[in-house]
Amino acid sequence: MLTRNPIVPENHVSNPIVDYEFNQDQSCLIVSTPKSFDIYNVHPLKRIMSQEMPDAGTIRMLHRTNYIAFVSTKKELLHIWDDVKKQDITRVKLDAAVKDLFLSREFIVVSQGDVISIFKFGNPWNKITEDIKFGGVCEFANGLLVYSNEFNLGQIHVTRLQTDAEQVVGKGVLVKAHANPVKMVRLNRKGDMVATCSQDGTLIRVFQTDNGVLVREFRRGLDRTSIIDMRWSPDGSKLAVVSDKWTLHVFEVFNDAENKRHVLKDWINIKYFQSEWSICNFKLKVSKGSNDCKIAWISDTGLVIVWPNRRLADTFKLNYNDDEHVWWLQLNQRNEIPL
């Protein structure tokens, strides 16, 4: 049953969301605005901290600790903020506009321009390797760094950052992921698989991170589209995907029998008819001007989609009917994100 908390107007000109992201286990959401940054518990949705900070742009938090990283909107400065001490513990001048920012207990990874910079988290604070040239797409989680190739944008590199080794960035694996440029990469929580999609948006592929072997190839649809976000379930068994067709798809990674296939798959030997489709999907109701969202898994069968333009968080339940052997998605709750 869908329950609704009060919905705020679509346009928030006075205090728009500048940036937002979930922490590493997706249990918290951090949001920056022109006035402050705020941290929320994702489920149930509740603001747990607010800090006046009119200069915060791109922002990330380290697990559920007191450490927050953000980039100034006025200057290319990376701040590491200690929320217990209510002060910066360090600042670093950057060379270009930041595309993305990733935190672990050992490293801070910053993608800016056409390079990735890696810093050691702690004291002393220093850059620990030469900048890595890349093709504009990257992800860092569980000590693994995945980034698109500088020259062939359909290929990705997967490498592990070594904390104690003399060579921080290992040799890694080169994966030929797509014919078109890679749009997005997502690591699962174990770090043994990476999901990729291209700018074409029709196919999502899953590869093993240790050897680059293709595990699954999913078809989102036939028409070209742009993938907005995709995330792994906590146990790594499912992958949720939202595109600008504004449909939420859920794919089964381990049990391929659960994914749908075309009725002509046994009759026509064409790749399209052999494709694996999502186990279920949900058509999202999107208002005019909504062009962004992010997914978080709150359990292996529960999801949240955050809509920054509308300041809303929708909670979904993934259900299974044992008698009919079918999955379906149910919208359970819609909450306002208070700022």
Swiss-Prot record:
Pfam families: PROPPIN. It is found in: Vacuole membrane; Cytoplasmic vesicle membrane. GO terms for cellular component: cytoplasmic vesicle membrane; vacuolar membrane. Keywords: Cytoplasmic vesicle, Membrane, Protein transport, Repeat, Transport, Vacuole, WD repeat. The keyword Cell wall biogenesis/degradation does not apply. The keyword Cell cycle does not apply. This is SVP1-like protein 2. The gene is HSV2.
